């Protein structure tokens, strides 16, 4: 299921995973009990991309016997010399992930492609009133509706009458989730951007519980008056990249954000109208693309509703160096290299077709080899075409920081993540053929 591409709530990218803003995004170079050159006991946890524990998978430190995670995803390996490499291997799903150069003793390791645990579902529908629903809203109006809880979120737009139909919800963890329903109405221009004095109403209704398999109908919310502010700034893109989109979200709680609009023009300077929701802040997402491959995304979080002169510098993604495209006779001794993404760590992706094993390497360095997983039944197949690419994640000062309690990727969407700025750079991809 994993594509070479991770992430975003935006309209330009259709990516499989999303990055966590904050939590693990620390610039510290070691973990809380990390160090260099010592002998330690590593006691960590393996989680899936949904944040749930992964049980019964082998965890390996070179030179040490492998150990399987327990039911809670926990593992412990004694007498480990720092810095160390550590791998999560699953022969059944034919995937292996290596973290390079760790010193922290309590890493959280993300098992890419895994979504363990029981998935719960539910939906809710209802009607929004107030604002410009008299009884129908004007044709130029848009009313966004969002349900959000600590475990999940979903959104839709209302019909002109204010009704909204089944917002689908999916979550892991508890069998019931309790959240709030948010609604925002505004008048938009032909491009879908809010106009001056365009915000007509905002409402929130809390304490809504959704049970697994539950369907809630007749959920309602009433809009109250909301003011309009102006939000301005400038985007700077890396050399060779073109600005593709700017998206703006209103963060209305720690677990909820309302998508305001997407501006898909290439204009670097922007001026938008935003809602004066008490206690809310703005999240700005800026996306840039490079002809021939390459994607850069930067998020500015915690911005004031009426912030002016905001400056966003999109970080330059990694660029592949060697081997050249369509290289042949590649084995686990061949070095793959790329340029660094400043302020981040690199996830190197080696992916073959069909049932071929997949390999992932998380490193702060600018080179890596394909992990030799033959002892675990995941040897590199002969004469097989593979694709490789490098994704950068930041801000992380080290792989230790990226192995913090929150990990570096979560199944939640960007607007639901913790406060803080973040960036991702996605390289172009190349192919190679393995050795006979």
Can you say where each PLM-predicted feature lies in the sequence?
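Sec-dependent bacterial lipoprotein signal peptides
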Residues: 1-23
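Sparse, context-dependent recognition of short Cys/His-centered cofactor- or disulfide-binding micro-motifs
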Residues: 5, 10, 44, 355, ...
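Prokaryotic Sec-type signal peptides and long signal-anchor helices
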Residues: 10-11, 390, 412
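Long luminal/extracellular ectodomains of secretory-pathway precursor proteins
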Residues: 20-364, 376-405
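A beta-strand/beta-hairpin structural motif
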Residues: 366-373
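Extracellular fibronectin type III
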Residues: 398-436
């Amino acid at each position: 299921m994993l594509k070479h591409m991770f992430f975003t709530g935006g309209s330009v990218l259709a990516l499989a995973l999303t990055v966590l803003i904050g939590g693990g995004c620390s610039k510290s170079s070691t973990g809380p009990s990390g160090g260099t050159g010592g002998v330690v006991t590593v006691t960590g946890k393996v989680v899936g991309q949904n944040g749930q524990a992964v049980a019964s998978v082998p965890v390996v430190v070179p030179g040490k016997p492998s150990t399987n995670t327990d039911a809670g995803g926990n593992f412990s390996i004694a007498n480990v010399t720092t810095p160390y490499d550590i791998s999560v291997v699953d022969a059944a799903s034919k995937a292996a992930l290596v973290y390079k150069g760790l010193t922290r003793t309590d890493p959280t390791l993300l098992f890419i492609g895994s979504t363990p645990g029981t998935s719960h579902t539910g939906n809710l529908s209802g009607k929004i009133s107030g604002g410009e629903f008299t009884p129908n809203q004007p044709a130029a109006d848009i009313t966004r509706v969002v349900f959000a809880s600590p475990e999940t979120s979903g959104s839709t737009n209302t019909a002109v009458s204010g009704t909204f139909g089944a917002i689908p919800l999916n979550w892991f963890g508890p069998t019931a989730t309790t959240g709030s329903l948010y609604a925002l109405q505004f008048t938009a221009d032909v491009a879908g951007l809010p106009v001056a004095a365009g915000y007509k109403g905002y409402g929130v209704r809390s304490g809504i519980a959704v049970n697994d398999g539950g369907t809630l109908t007749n959920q309602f919310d009433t809009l109250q008056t909301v003011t309009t502010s102006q939000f301005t700034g400038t985007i700077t893109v890396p050399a060779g990249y073109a600005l593709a989109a700017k998206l703006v979200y209103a963060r209305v709680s720690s677990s909820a954000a309302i998508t305001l609009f997407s501006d898909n023009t290439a204009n670097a300077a922007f001026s938008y109208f935003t809602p004066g929701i008490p206690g809310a802040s703005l999240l700005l997402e800026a996306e840039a693309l490079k002809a021939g491959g390459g994607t850069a995304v930067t998020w500015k979080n915690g911005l004031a509703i009426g912030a002016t002169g905001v400056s966003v510098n999109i970080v330059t993604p990694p660029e592949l160096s060697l081997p050249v495209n369509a290289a042949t006779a590649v084995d686990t001794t061949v070095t793959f290299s790329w340029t660094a993404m400043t302020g981040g760590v690199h996830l190197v992706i080696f992916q073959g077709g069909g049932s071929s094993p997949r390999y992932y390497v998380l490193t702060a360095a600018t080179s890596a080899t394909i992990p030799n997983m033959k002892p675990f039944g995941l040897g590199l197949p002969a004469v097989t075409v593979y694709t490789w690419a490098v994704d950068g994640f930041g801000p992380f000062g080290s792989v230790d920081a990226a192995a913090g309690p929150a990990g570096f990727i979560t199944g939640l969407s960007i607007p639901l993540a913790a406060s803080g700025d973040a960036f991702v750079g996605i390289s172009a991809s190349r192919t190679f053929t393995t050795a006979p």
